[in-house]
Amino acid sequence: MYGFGRGNMFRNRSTRYRRRPRYRAENYHSYMLDLLENMNEEFGRNWWGTPESHQPDSGPSSLQVESVELYTRDNAREHNTFMYDLVDGTKPVLILRRGQPFSIAIRFKRNYNPQQDRLKLEIGFGQQPLITKGTLIMLPVSGSDTFTKDKTQWDVRLRQHDGAVITLEIQIPAAVAVGVWKMKIVSQLTSEEQPNVSAVTHECKNKTYILFNPWCKQDSVYMEDEQWRKEYVLSDVGKIFTGSFKQPVGRRWIFGQFTDSVLPACMLILERSGLDYTARSNPIKVVRAISAMVNNIDDEGVLEGRWQEPYDDGVAPWMWTGSSAILEKYLKTRGVPVKYGQCWVFAGVANTVSRALGIPSRTVTNYDSAHDTDDTLTIDKWFDKNGDKIEDATSDSIWNFHVWNDCWMARPDLPTGYGGWQAYDSTPQETSEGVYQTGPASVLAVQRGEIGYMFDSPFVFSEVNADVVHWQEDDSSETGYKKLKIDSYRVGRLLLTKKIGVDDDFGDADAEDITDQYKNKEGTDEERMSVLNAARSSGFNYAFNLPSPEKEDVYFNLLDIEKIKIGQPFHVTVNIENQSSETRRVSAVLSASSIYYTGITGRKIKRENGNFSLQPHQKEVLSIEVTPDEYLEKLVDYAMIKLYAIATVKETQQTWSEEDDFMVEKPNLELEIRGNLQVGTAFVLAISLTNPLKRVLDNCFFTIEAPGVTGAFRVTNRDIQPEEVAVHTVRLIPQKPGPRKIVATFSSRQLIQVVGSKQVEVLD
């Protein structure tokens, strides 16, 4: 069911992946409304508190709860949750991790007598907690000061008793469901003088979050290395790599998993997913739900995807600076999908949700990422007789980059050794250019070509290993097309993630190459064997049969363009050399177009034909010169340009094709701090931009975000003159001490996706 036949999954996804609430009781709608109200209320507690109501006194003989102390901050320090804003709100929220104990104190309205007062805790999870499902826990409080059960079970011990006050320590097993738990305290007098006294129940109004625990060896998300935990669980700012294989560009992203709106939004996501409450103990199923719910296809998820203009009715994907503003909007609108996201935005939000829930997670960027729609492990590109690409001949495509996530967990459902990093992808399927929601798929299984293991490993494998085949119209061929080229090294050329413990605001020294974790080195026997192993498993090994070699005595070479700065011209060249002792007649086509990062052609920029009669050992050049005026108005989202070159030798029927792409480089924003950085004290942030164009920039605005300093906000700016150095200043007041990251973006009608960031230290 899982991991096989992705082509069928694509065709049937509208029904196969449609998610509906699992609980169909008549009160489910009311339950969801109540949940939303509570989450919005909890999110708002940073600004106003909600008084706790108490159980009314039912008689002098009954043991009444006067108050409950949850030791929210003390428990948070022990459970590595002290960073969550909800812990420090006006009414602090208890946030715990499974697999370790926590402490509470209860004050009664009279002295507690263990011989007469029967006391128990009821801890429940979900709409209808049940003992049989493990979502309702009954914990009798005895006089024991030690735990009597093993660590796989809930338990409670009496740490201290002082008259009307008792202190309890409660043991949470390492395999309980994650989410919001509620607690009741039930007491009943058992004296012979008053044998019929009714039990009294006190419901704790404060909810308790229980999360996955990467610090606990018994938890399936356990991660041993402390530096890894700091990076993949605790780091709330990182980098997501975009750009191209030759020009990777790290974009600063604020994950913001500790922001006050994020955990409530995560609970809403899990509710909307329809995931069974008991299944929420399993990180495999939780991650699969995240993969489905971060996009809005079929299930009212977080983000709506859009890969081309217009974005006027929402926020353009490149204007987001982090995840928390997206999740906050989703929560405040009670689950209305937020507009708009693209793969790296989906991955950023998925990373935030996973880390917030305690699942170690990282973003992964695959350069030249294949979208194989027919499970052949090939990406077919088709060209007409004139050498122009036929855009709608296939739904296969190669994205200049695609971003997904890896999560860290054990995989008891797979053979030994396939735990560790698991790929999952929350980018939604689109009928023309989207990719599938995916995973979790064992990265080791992908590397080995073991595509039979759950979940969706065939698709992930093809993303990094598919072969690229070029075809051209040919009337003399039985199929109407001739095979120009097979490129086994075009796809999955580089996979990057942020390096542990390294942070670079001015370059990309913090990029880590993890290509070898996903695939063996290109050209090695191991690499080809993994591909052929996967091809045999999929039944399409015939696709890798190479054509018979033809006489090839004319040499062609498309010169790479490393990078150009926006506003500068560029030059494209194909070198041609007749290496034979005979005359050769060559027809060649060279073209340049803007492209979306998904590989879809944006606008054609320039095209040049060449017909040459080459004498023995003669050299020729086909080239095009492109000026700024010819390409600036034709650039699309990420300022990427695709080059195609195709040539045919008449005498030998030798054919040749090549492609290349590059990014037009944009300036960075420069951030300067004016004043002292101290909690509660205003300072000035100055943002500088040098206009690289010889034209006016209008409709200008900045987006700024800095966790612990300010949430995301937008400010407009005046028009910026040609080649002007513009400076915009804003006044900010830090809210929290410690190291803080400030991220800013700039956009105008003529220039978009200009980014800058700065690391600062805020004093208490």
Curated annotation (Swiss-Prot):
Output the SMART domains linked to this UniProt entry: TGc (SM00460)
Topology relative to the lipid bilayer, per the entry, is:
Peripheral membrane protein
* Keyword list, A-Z: Acyltransferase, Calcium, Membrane, Metal-binding, Transferase
Q: Endoplasmic reticulum: present as a keyword of the record?
A: no
Q: Which family does it belong to?
A: Belongs to the transglutaminase superfamily. Transglutaminase family.
Cite the GO molecular-function annotations of the record: metal ion binding; protein-glutamine gamma-glutamyltransferase activity
Q: Which prosthetic group or cofactor does it need?
A: Ca(2+)
Q: How is the cofactor bound?
A: Binds 1 Ca(2+) ion per subunit.
Write out the function statement from the record.
Answer: Catalyzes the cross-linking of proteins and the conjugation of polyamines to proteins.
**Which residues does the entry assign to the active site, renumbered to this chain?**
C343, H402, D425
**Protein name from the UniProt record:** Hemocyte protein-glutamine gamma-glutamyltransferase
Tissue specificity as recorded in UniProt: Mainly expressed in hemocytes, hepatopancreas, and gastric tissues. On the other hand nothing was detected in the heart, intestine and muscle.
| Entry EC no(s) | 2.3.2.13
Ligand binding (Ca(2+))? N465, D467, E522, E527
Q: Which PANTHER family match?
A: HEMOCYTE PROTEIN-GLUTAMINE GAMMA-GLUTAMYLTRANSFERASE-LIKE PROTEIN, PROTEIN-GLUTAMINE GAMMA-GLUTAMYLTRANSFERASE
Q: Show the Pfam families listed in the entry.
A: Transglut_C, Transglut_core, Transglut_N
Annotated source species: Tachypleus tridentatus
Give a GO cellular-component term. Answer: membrane
